Amino acid sequence: MAENQYYGTGRRKSSAARVFIKPGNGKIVINQRSLEQYFGRETARMVVRQPLELVDMVEKLDLYITVKGGGISGQAGAIRHGITRALMEYDESLRGELRKAGFVTRDARQVERKKVGLRKARRRPQFSKR
């Protein structure tokens, strides 16, 4: 491994992302594909870029990311969390700014399980009075 490479693990819902950061010119590679190829939705791309834009490092760092599990928004959130952790490893002074924006905290919300006798997690079968 290169000496000037920084690592962060991010998780969100059922997705997990491994993020490697090194000085470069702003190239983002996710599972051997570019950011534009991997995420069709602009909202997901924005979520991924948020921590980099906050600390003005979009053009200064190259990112190599592998992400598994979950759907589009979960993967985007996991990547954002991983980038945030890698940035903190890169420069600890960024922690306060990232924390204020809410990127450091792991979003612990998970899908609630379906219960027996109900149609979904909380949706009850229709009630008929007569």
Curated annotation (Swiss-Prot):
It comes from Salmonella typhimurium (strain LT2 / SGSC1412 / ATCC 700720). One of its GO terms (cellular component) is cytosolic small ribosomal subunit. The keyword Ribonucleoprotein applies. GO terms for biological process: translation. Belongs to the universal ribosomal protein uS9 family. This is Small ribosomal subunit protein uS9. Binds ObgE/YhbZ (AC Q8ZLS5). Keywords: Ribonucleoprotein, Ribosomal protein. InterPro entries: Ribosomal_Su5_D2-typ_SF, Ribosomal_uS9, Ribosomal_uS9_bac/plastid, Ribosomal_uS9_CS, Ribsml_uS5_D2-typ_fold_subgr. One of its GO terms (molecular function) is RNA binding. It comes from the Bacteria. It holds the Pfam family Ribosomal_S9.
